[in-house]
Regions:
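Glycine- and acidic-residue-biased ligand/ion/polar-headgroup-sensing regions
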Residues: 81-84, 91-110, 209-212, 219-239
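Bacterial N-terminal signal peptides that target proteins for export
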Residues: 2-16
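Short acidic-glycine-tyrosine-enriched beta hairpin
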Residues: 111-130, 238-259
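A short, N-terminal "cap"/entry segment at the start of jelly-roll beta-barrel domains
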Residues: 31-74, 156-202, 288-290
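Conserved short histidine dyad/triad with adjacent acidic residue
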Residues: 74-91, 129, 202-219, 257-258
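C-terminal segment of classical bacterial N-terminal signal peptides
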Residues: 18-29
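Short beta-strand His + acidic residue motifs that chelate non-heme Fe in jelly-roll/DSBH
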Residues: 86-88, 106-107, 115, 127, ...
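Double-stranded beta-helix
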Residues: 38-44, 114, 134-173, 243-246, ...
């Protein structure tokens, strides 16, 4: 259930006009240079403008993979407007939330919007199973990416079961919610949760420098990828041909299908992605045809 409050928001408009005269602008890439068909049986993807949205009690939602009410991995996006809050609740299993845009205000225990901490785009939250928590938005809205293993439903918390701890920076109970702020994250790739070589959910952040490409490879189990920054260029054939790739920008979603051969790279700009799946899984490289 959500609580909606009203606020007065400043309204501003800006118009930017750029005129290019007396010169021609040419941008050339060594990838994506021709019409490309991605093998959707090896790798499926959804561009931001292709996502299907529906209104729910939790906000405007786009389901990307699986179903939280059913067994297995799930992934979905929620958009919430300004001044929208959830009531204290808990989940059956751990849930993992990444802030894609805007600011999320998170709290634990008794509902109190003043006892929350802000998480900006790129920040990550682990909601621990059974832990009572709440969250919401203030003057700006938020876009959130959720992943986890179902079935895991939302259960409202009884008022008598909520407690309040700490003050200031200590308002988040780490036994209920574990927070990783974007500004405190390492600048290189790292594991957020789990281990892909062991049973259970794993979550990884991967950063790539410009023009950093993988070899053609496949995975033993499906995994899902969210582009958090830059552009991910994806292909689906053993050749690893960079000219036969499709650009997936920030906010795009990719499903690597088990046993499907694929490859990818960062192009001319740095790339930042989040990878999630269920272990144990392995990556097997594929030699290009001779």
């Amino acid at each position: 259930m959500t609580i909606r409050t009203r606020g007065t928001l400043p309204v501003c408009a800006a118009t930017v006009v750029v005129t290019l005269a007396g010169a021609s602008l040419s941008i050339q890439h060594s990838f994506g240079a021709q019409a490309v068909v991605i093998d959707r049986g090896s790798r499926d993807y959804t561009l931001p403008e292709q996502m299907q949205w529906r209104a729910t009690e939790d906000g405007t939602t786009s389901s990307l993979y699986g179903d939280p009410s059913k067994p297995g991995l799930y992934a979905y996006i929620v958009k919430r407007g300004p001044n929208v809050w959830s009531k204290p609740h808990f989940h059956d299993n751990d849930r993992f939330v990444t802030v894609l845009d805007g600011t999320l205000w998170v709290g634990t225990g008794k509902f109190d919007p003043q006892r929350t901490v802000p998480l900006k785009a790129g920040s990550f939250v682990r909601d621990i199973a059974g832990g009572i928590h709440f969250e919401g938005t203030k003057d700006d809205g938020v876009t959130l990416y959720f992943i986890g293993i179902g079935p895991s439903l939302n259960h409202p918390a009884e008022a008598s079961t909520t407690t309040t701890i700490g003050s200031g920076a200590d308002v988040i109970d780490p036994a209920v919610r574990q927070v990783q702020r974007a500004e405190e994250m390492p600048k290189e790739s790292f594991v957020l949760y789990g281990d892909s070589s062991k049973p259970g959910l794993y979550v990884q952040y991967q950063r790539r420098a410009p023009n950093n490409w993988s070899r053609p490879h496949y995975h033993s189990i499906d995994r899902v990828v969210m582009v958090l920054g830059g552009t991910m260029w994806i292909g689906t054939e053993p050749s690893g041909d960079r000219t036969r790739t499709v650009a997936v920008p920030k906010g795009g979603f990719i499903r690597d299908i088990a046993q499907g051969i694929h490859y990818d790279g960062s192009g001319n700009d740095p790339m930042w992605i989040q990878i999630a799946g269920v272990g144990p899984t392995a990556t097997t490289n594929v030699d290009p045809p001779k």
